[in-house]
Structures are given as C-alpha cells and as structure tokens.
C-alpha cells in the first residue's frame, strides 16, 4: 500500500444502506440511516435515545481545506495522513472530559472505527459559537485597522497582536446563509452580536430566549476545560469554534448539546507554550497550514479576497503542494492528538476497507 492509499480522501461513496442523499461537507460525510436501521441499532446497541430518533453514520476524511478550498499534494496525495483519525480522537477525548465535568452531552452515540461516529439527528443552532482568549486572526486584523467594536464588544485601547485578552470573549458568526434577519447580511460567516441573536433568537434556531445564556455557558465552560487540559501539556488554547443543537431525550424534553467537533486543530488555534513564552508563535493547528499557503503562493490576496474565489478554486485545483508540507501538517495533527489523548493515532493501510468490514459485520449496514 502506498502513502496515498492510506489517506481517506473520498468518503461519500461507501455502500452504506440509506434512503436519503449523502450529505458531503468539507471534511465529513453524513449517511442518514433508514428508519428501520435506526430503530434496530437503538434497540440492539442500547443507545440512550428515544426509539424513533433518526441516526446517521458520520465518516470523516483526511481532506485538508483552507480558505474554503480543498488542497492536495504531490504523488497523488489527496489528503493528510492521519488527519481524520486525529481529529476524531481529539474530539472524543474532549467530549468525554466534558461529560466528566458535568457539561452537556454530544451528538455521538457510538464510535465503531477511528474515522466513524454514529450520531443522533439534532436541530442545529445557526451560530458559529466562537470563543477567544487571545487577540489574533480576524479580530487582530480588524483591531489593527482601528476597529474597536467586534461582534458588539468594545475592545480596550493598547492591545498588541497575540496578547492574552482581559476576558474570555464570545464572538459569534452566522452558520450558513441566513435570510430575513434585520441587520444581518445574507452571507456565510458574518460576525454578529449577542443583541442580534437576542432580537432574532428563533431565526437563529434557539427554542427559548434563555437558551442563549446556556449556550454561552456551555461554550465558556467547554473552553475552560480544554484550556486547562492543554495547559497541562504546555499548549495554549487561543480560540475555538463550537457548534450546538437540540435533541429530544427519552422523556420528550429538548436539550442543548455539543455538535460536530470540539477543540481540534481544525476548529481551534493552539500554540506551543514554550515558544509563546519566548515571544514566538508556533502553531499546532491548521493555522500553520494557512500561513504556509500564504507564503507559498506569489499572490496571497487570492486566498484572502472573497471577490477572487474562482481564481482561488483554480489555484487549489491545479497545484500539487510539496509532500513535505503535507507531512508537516500530518505531524502537527497526530502530534497534538497523541499529546491530548496520551495514545498513538492508528493509521490503517486501507481505512475504507476497514470501515466497510466493521459496518457490515458489527452493524449490518452495508448493502
């Protein structure tokens, strides 16, 4: 098997029994199970959800996206070796820690394989729940241009790039394109304020006004749990994005849960603690890959300017990135995962075959 064979790049063509179209995201694909299979698994596997809960198989890939494009490497390498397994392992670890600390549940019911989650269907909150402990990235870019109000929060004068903020800040943005909300442009990833959410809480998917307080508490509490654990291995939790949704429990009550992934190098910035104390930034997240791309291509504006999206897509499609750059990302992701979990990340030679075998033999879900 070659290195390219060990990468799961295409994850939306598995022969999983479903009666709905496969939903393909940038990194994960979701296969909604039939009602009969959902009910069977809930009963035979003992999942603690109502018997009529829709279930899905969520399969992560090793694809690498940045600036809203998928990139690939030399030698037919269509993704990052170990990336998918690393992301899932990190999220699994944090979700377990959240449960131990009495925080909310996640959408994950079962983990058949390092690349696979069995999840319950949730009603998503249409907010990218972003939490920041340091001023960097888009917040710093806005601040350096003189902006002092960010997502409705007034920032103090005199802040310097990459410094720790006086408070842990929640700076939400829209999840997807939302229409008909006063003062909120119908664009993806638009910064919004808490007052925007309060005035239109149902349009953002909140069932009750007071659930805004709950989502903020779960966001901050989750951030603090991860930040403390990362500090114990001398890593700095800089900022992150969480996602939330509602599920119905066995008693028929709605409850807010964590969704998607949490605290990963894809959804967060993580800095090396020793380097930060020396006044340097050593990225242990996808931000390092983004910086590589900005330096690698002669015209970085293509990657930053939303008006040049066709050029950006062509750039990603037509350029094989150096193998060493791809492997550096692999080392970053697997390294963080091994530090966080304390265990080596499995790198199966043929992950797709492994997934099909397990889902056939242990779950009877393969056509």
From Swiss-Prot:
It is an enzyme of class 6 (ligase). It catalyses: 5-amino-1-(5-phospho-D-ribosyl)imidazole-4-carboxylate + L-aspartate + ATP = (2S)-2-[5-amino-1-(5-phospho-beta-D-ribosyl)imidazole-4-carboxamido]succinate + ADP + phosphate + 2 H(+). One of its GO terms (cellular component) is cytoplasm. Its EC number is 6.3.2.6. Gene3D superfamilies: ATP-grasp fold, B domain, Phosphorylase Kinase, domain 1. GO terms for biological process: 'de novo' IMP biosynthetic process. Pfam families: SAICAR_synt (PF01259). Pathway: Purine metabolism; IMP biosynthesis via de novo pathway; 5-amino-1-(5-phospho-D-ribosyl)imidazole-4-carboxamide from 5-amino-1-(5-phospho-D-ribosyl)imidazole-4-carboxylate: step 1/2. Disulfide bonds: none annotated. It comes from the Bacteria. InterPro entries: SAICAR_synt/ADE2_N (IPR028923), SAICAR_synthase_Vibrio-typ (IPR014106), SAICAR_synthetase_CS (IPR018236). Keywords: ATP-binding, Ligase, Nucleotide-binding, Purine biosynthesis. One of its GO terms (molecular function) is ATP binding. Belongs to the SAICAR synthetase family. HAMAP family: SAICAR_synth. This is Phosphoribosylaminoimidazole-succinocarboxamide synthase. It comes from Shewanella putrefaciens (strain CN-32 / ATCC BAA-453).
């Amino acid at each position: 098997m070659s290195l390219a064979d060990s990468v799961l790049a295409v994850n939306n063509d598995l022969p999983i029994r479903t009666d709905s179209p496969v939903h393909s995201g940038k990194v994960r694909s979701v296969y909604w199970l039939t009602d009969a299979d959902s009910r069977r698994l809930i009963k035979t596997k003992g999942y603690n959800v109502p018997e009529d809960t829709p279930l899905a198989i969520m399969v992560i890939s090793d694809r690498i996206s940045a600036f809203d494009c998928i990139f690939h490497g030399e030698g037919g390498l269509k993704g990052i070796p170990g990336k998918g397994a690393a992301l899932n392992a990190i999220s699994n670890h944090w979700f377990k820690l959240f449960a131990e600390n009495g925080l909310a549940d996640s959408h994950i019911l079962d983990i058949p394989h390092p690349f696979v989650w069995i999840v319950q269907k949730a009603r998503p909150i249409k907010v990218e729940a972003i939490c920041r402990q340091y001023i960097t990235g888009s917040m710093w870019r806005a601040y350096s241009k003189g902006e002092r109000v960010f997502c409705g929060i007034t920032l103090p004068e005199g802040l310097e790039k990459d410094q720790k903020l006086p408070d842990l800040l929640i700076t939400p943005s829209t999840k997807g394109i939302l229409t008909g909300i006063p003062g909120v442009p119908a664009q993806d990833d638009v910064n919004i304020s808490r007052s925007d959410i309060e005035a239109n809480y149902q349009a953002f998917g909140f069932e009750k006004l007071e659930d805004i307080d709950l989502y903020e508490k779960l966001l901050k509490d989750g951030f603090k749990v991860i930040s403390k654990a990362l500090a114990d291995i001398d890593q700095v939790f800089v900022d992150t994005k969480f996602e939330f949704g509602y599920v119905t429990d066995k008693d028929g009550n709605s409850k807010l849960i964590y969704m998607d992934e949490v605290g990963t190098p894809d959804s967060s910035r993580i800095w090396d603690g020793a380097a930060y104390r020396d006044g340097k930034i050593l990225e242990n997240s996808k931000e390092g890959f983004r910086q590589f791309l900005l330096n690698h291509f002669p015209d970085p504006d293509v990657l930053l300017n939303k008006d040049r999206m066709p050029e950006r897509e062509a750039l990603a499609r037509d350029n094989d990135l150096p193998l060493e750059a791809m492997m550096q990302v692999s080392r970053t992701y697997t390294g963080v995962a091994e530090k966080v979990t304390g265990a080596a990340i499995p790198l199966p030679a043929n992950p797709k075959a492994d997934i099909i075998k397990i889902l056939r033999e242990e779950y009877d879900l393969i056509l």
